[in-house]
């Protein structure tokens, strides 16, 4: 096999490696029962959490009291038709008067607060914490050698820096390759659609299409396999474009060491004890995830719209600290403190990361919440990692004054 052919086959193999996982994440099976998550295995034959059974058998005739649940996330659509009646309202604030009526340091915080915005706008994308740490340590260690004389503390930092740089370069290379392959995939798909000559495509169109090269053959094969899952072409095309957006964000924002949007916030980032910054736009530029989470918790159970939330007494306090990228410890800590100080009894944190910039400031906020008898719920993640062996921040182990994690 010629060298150029081997290169082509290697690229094609990697192309399939990149593309197939994107679709495997979106595979569809039989439609689940409505509100399956609230159903019961014994009563309904569904592995739900037995919400409906609890209401009918344990809570029947009982009247609950409202509980404020803070959703620390990427934003919440407080006007969503299935949530708007379940949103926490700060009755001490007068809407839109530009005054901090309740003197808590946050102007017009009617439904919560956004710690990653300002009068300049909102942060949508940010780096991974890994990238921020590499950028922070670069001036000191980028040109250092293994033979360079360091103190014990510096040697530890240098070794950690080398480890992080290796991880960063590996992630960046994979993301760049993924983006390149998604560009090829998108261009090939556009070419195929143009040749077919119609927009409302069906399976038969791809069965009748004659690919002119190996890439087209693979694209057609993938699209046909997606049609076999009873998907419409519009949905398939959306998933392809989402794949492109995923890798584009990784390359241009998450892993771009020259990208730093913090100036939008305008805070003193080195001052972890700074509290009052941000704005009151709790929805932000992308509230899909936070709205989803809030809906699971508290979507109206009586309006026949969408799903029914787990609780009919939860009131959602929206706190925005999570961008498209890794959240920052200072913002997480302030989000926790804001929730506690403004009456939340439960804090939901559906986010996490593998590195921490300032673990101590988050630990102190967690301890503060515990002292006020507030329950914190933190996600384990979606990537099947053993979090006893691999870091996922914030975690249950507090750091001492030297930053070393101690116990649980």
Task: State the predicted function of each range.
Residues 56-69, 76-328, 406-407:
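Subtilisin-like serine protease catalytic core
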Residues 107, 318, 348, 376-378:
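Hydrophobic residues in well-ordered beta-strands that form the structural core
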Residues 68, 315, 345, 373-375:
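Proline-centered loop/turn at the N-terminus of a beta-strand
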Residues 28-41, 143-177, 183-186, 336-359, ...:
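Short acidic, glycine-rich surface-loop motifs adjacent to enzyme active sites
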Residues 3-4, 25-46, 374:
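Sec-dependent signal peptide cleavage junction
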Residues 56-60, 76, 88, 298-302, ...:
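Sec-exported extracytoplasmic/periplasmic mature domains
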Residues 1-29:
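Bacterial Sec-dependent N-terminal signal peptides
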Residues 328-329, 352-408:
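Substrate-binding/specificity loop regions of serine endopeptidase catalytic domains
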